[in-house]
Amino acid sequence: MTFSEILDRVGSMGRFQFLHVAILGLPILNMANHNLLQIFTAATPVHHCRPPPNASTGPWVLPMGPNGKPERCLRFVHPPNASLPNETQRATEPCLDGWVYNSTKDSIVTEWDLVCNSNKLKEMAQSIFMAGILIGGLVLGDLSDRFGRRPILTCSYLLLAASGSGAAFSPTFPIYMVFRFLCGFGISGITLSTVILNVEWVPTRMRAIMSTALGYCYTFGQFILPGLAYAIPQWRWLQLTVSIPFFIFFLSSWWTPESIRWLVLSGKSSKALKILRRVAAFNGKKEEGERLSLEELKLNLQKEIALAKAKYTASDLFRIPMLRRMTFCLSLAWFATGFAYYSLAMGVEEFGVNLYILQIIFGGVDVPAKFITILSLSYLGRHTTQAAALLLAGGAILALTFVPLDLQTVRTVLAVFGKGCLPSSFSCLFLYTSELYPTVIRQTGMGVSNLWTRVGSMLSPLVKITGEVQPFIPNIIYGITALLGGSAAFFLPETLNQPLPETIEDLENWSLRAKKPKQEPEVEKASQRIPLQPHGPGLGSS
């Protein structure tokens, strides 16, 4: 008897599964608000130097830029030198008395004057948040293996709720960055546990649908944020509004059951059996649940227990040439996807279009993009889909370099197209990486690969600072990186309709078969298929 058959006995798609997926999905819906929050809480309005006390606000105080508007970071020295009759010859100085902001909405930029020489701090805040996700993945992944999925999920909900609320009351910018780091740390724990707990409790035939539903929760969450930001103009209240729900999720998570596989592998089979019987009773199959025994449960997971005893580390990813090449190519693709995604997702205000409408469009393009990706993965294959997604995204980003700023419509269309390609890349990478790595080292391979997408996400905001040297430099860097990531996919083997490798030896045999003349394809067993799982930047770990 397999675990899927045990799941069928207790109810594989009963009331429990639907409630379970809903409880896991609602936090993902709200998690998108935190990932993209700085689009609105760190918006930079039009601004100019505050005039000196007792000075008139006119051209004698504020020098005009090439566009006929006041310079944002300079003002004339006051009082003026009477010996210089031409105002263009007057000396200028930085904004010594602060700035005047042309906006009714406040943000961390207007509160702490993160403009001109301090504008780098705005990008630093987003990178600090991404660093929290990166460090959280490294720390909480190990803790999840030691203490279980549910405790990490529960603590992560509480951490995100508390640190998000703390950020709303931050008295200074450094304290705000500390809380944002902790927010990212909590998000990483939520992602890690949610993906595992979602997949385990649904049957194989329904995993694609349920994983699709979970993936779309993040997509639809992107529609909520613009509405909240429009209705709540104060950044502190907006920060608090998106954080409070996680206190509720913290309470509801106590209903979420622990991973059965983790319990059995940790020597807690009796507790696993109690949970299975509780699920059976909830699904109206109490008698079937009572018939289950510890012997059946252990026998079912015997293979997984044996695999768990085989210890593999990240160094094993570089032990054989094929595995080493795969790791390099996948890491580059993951890095490029996270790097390019956040260049567009967090650069909404750069296109000169209504911030709220464009964010809704950016979220909406994910819906058809993920659907097209599923079709492409099924019919064109993995490495073709992966290469196309990143190459098209890179091409769109590079094209932005050559489109004048006044052609806002063209620039917006290119940005939306590129944004749609990048979630497709995430979706493909999640499936592709799972299929390429052998079972005995799959979790390690996924962890290393996902580490690189977090590094890319963390570095992405910092690259925008190079725009101060030349405005086109950031898009050149983003675009070329995406093209390199797409090209790396051509060096990866195709996995469509191929059996999953269980051990490193299986992978070596797969490599030897690939060098032989092409024969009839091996029929893939249904039990070996990994479902297509739409993936997003907030669902980056498993």
UniProtKB/Swiss-Prot annotation:
One of its GO terms (biological process) is monoatomic ion transport. Keywords: Cell membrane, Detoxification, Glycoprotein, Ion transport, Lipid transport, Membrane, Phosphoprotein, Transmembrane, Transmembrane helix, Transport. The chain crosses the membrane at residues 21-41, 124-144, 155-175, 177-197, 213-233, 237-257, 328-348, 355-375, 387-407, 472-492. It is found in: Basolateral cell membrane. Residues 517-527 have a biased composition (Basic and acidic residues). Residues 515-542 are annotated as: Disordered. It catalyses: estrone 3-sulfate(out) + glutarate(in) = estrone 3-sulfate(in) + glutarate(out); estrone 3-sulfate(in) + 2-oxoglutarate(out) = estrone 3-sulfate(out) + 2-oxoglutarate(in); glutarate(in) + 2-oxoglutarate(out) = glutarate(out) + 2-oxoglutarate(in); urate(in) + 2-oxoglutarate(out) = urate(out) + 2-oxoglutarate(in). Residues 1-20, 145-154, 198-212, 258-327, 376-386, 493-542 are cytoplasmic. SUPFAM superfamilies: MFS general substrate transporter. Residues 42-123, 176, 234-236, 349-354, 408-471 are extracellular. One of its GO terms (molecular function) is antiporter activity. PANTHER family: SOLUTE CARRIER FAMILY 22 MEMBER. Functions as an organic anion/dicarboxylate exchanger that couples organic anion uptake indirectly to the sodium gradient. Transports organic anions such as estrone 3-sulfate (E1S) and urate in exchange for dicarboxylates such as glutarate or ketoglutarate (2-oxoglutarate). Plays an important role in the excretion of endogenous and exogenous organic anions, especially from the kidney and the brain. E1S transport is pH- and chloride-dependent and may also involve E1S/cGMP exchange. This is Organic anion transporter 3. It comes from Pongo abelii.
